């Protein structure tokens, strides 16, 4: 009970920061095997030794073997893992199933060896350093090609060339799907399906990529609770440009995604991965 209480205290704390952290890609379709490198992150919250689909923490992606060959690296957001030590959680589990809520729960679970996050996480709201890694045993991820990371300054180069705004991206993740204008407000459902949806880049700052997920305005899909740490792919490629960090509480307007091509992001990622 103490472990559960600490976990929910951590969740409530996250909900109090200036924007709502985002824990499935809605407005799209079941992903099937389009993005097999996108996985779901779990923790054994009730301590029963069995992982349920409802113990989903976040989404993330397989980024390849570590530079030293010691681990397979699962990339996610810092806020997906930073709460764990204070809640007594010492291990995470990753599944690359495209559905994690069947009767047997997620299958092919890989238990972490360790996990880490950017030590500067949450120190600066302008650059949240919202990057984390879950370190899996070397060679444990098989038959799945990793995502590609972007070169340094990739998005700045697109902006300088005048081609950034409106660039097509693909959103992929697990988690909740919102239904708006319901009695009592927005309602959320969870079926544990990995989904993919289309998006377009709206803007860029030093640390963030923004896109508009107002479906009535754009026709695009969006992200919601369950998607934290999920990757944004440059459409038609395996290159990811950012990971999901936060958005509005109704999962209806803007979304904030942490860039992977900046000096600060690369400083952390370079501790674990060979960078382009």
Place the predicted regions along the sequence by residue.
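Short beta-strand segments
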Residues: 54-58, 106-113, 145, 188, ...
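Core beta-strand residues in small-molecule sensory/regulatory alpha/beta domains
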Residues: 42-45, 233
């Amino acid at each position: 009970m103490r472990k559960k209480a600490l976990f929910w205290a951590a969740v409530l704390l996250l909900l109090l920061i200036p924007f709502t952290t985002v824990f499935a890609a809605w407005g799209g379709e079941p992903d099937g095997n389009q993005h097999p490198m996108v996985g779901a992150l779990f923790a054994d919250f009730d301590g029963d030794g069995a992982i349920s689909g409802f113990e989903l923490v976040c989404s993330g992606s397989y980024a390849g073997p570590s530079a030293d060959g010691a681990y397979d690296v699962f990339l996610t957001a810092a806020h997906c893992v930073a709460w764990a030590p204070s809640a007594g959680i010492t291990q995470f589990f990753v599944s690359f199933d495209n559905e994690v809520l069947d009767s047997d729960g997620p299958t092919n679970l890989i238990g972490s060896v360790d996990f880490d996050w950017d030590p500067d996480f949450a120190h600066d709201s302008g650059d949240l350093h919202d990057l984390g890694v879950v370190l899996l045993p070397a060679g444990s991820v098989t038959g799945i090609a990793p995502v590609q990371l972007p070169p340094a300054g990739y998005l700045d180069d697109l902006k300088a060339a005048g081609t950034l705004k409106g660039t097509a991206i693909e959103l992929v993740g697990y988690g909740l799907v919102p239904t708006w204008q319901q009695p009592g407000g927005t309602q959320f459902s969870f079926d544990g399906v990995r989904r993919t949806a289309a998006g377009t880049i709206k803007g860029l700052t030093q640390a963030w990529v923004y896109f508009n997920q107002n479906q009535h305005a754009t026709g695009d899909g969006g992200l919601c609770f369950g998607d934290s740490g999920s990757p944004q792919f440059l459409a038609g490629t395996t290159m990811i440009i950012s990971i999901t960090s936060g958005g509005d509480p109704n999962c209806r307007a803007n979304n904030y995604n942490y860039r992977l091509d900046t000096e600060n992001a690369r400083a952390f990622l370079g501790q674990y991965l060979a960078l382009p």
